[in-house]
Swiss-Prot record:
This is Long neurotoxin LNTX-2. PROSITE patterns: SNAKE_TOXIN. Expressed by the venom gland. Gene3D superfamilies: CD59 (2.10.60.10).
Amino acid sequence: MKTLLLTLVVVTIVCLDFGYARTCLKTPEVKSEPCPPGQEVCYTKAWRDRMCSFRGKVIELGCAATCPRQEPGKEITCCSTDDCNTHP
């Protein structure tokens, strides 16, 4: 009986994924990092600033609890799988 109980406990621990965290690419390093608890959405924000003609669009990558709101002049895309917010 104890062996059966121990087996069930081991199987439960192996099957459950304790501590899983979504991973998203984050700037400025454009590096995959785990998101804080509760943040399951990866996002990409792109916009033009005064230096755009020299360096191109400003890109921000990160994690959020929900997709950030659209803002005038900013392109925002969201996804919900690991490292899905690739650098454009």
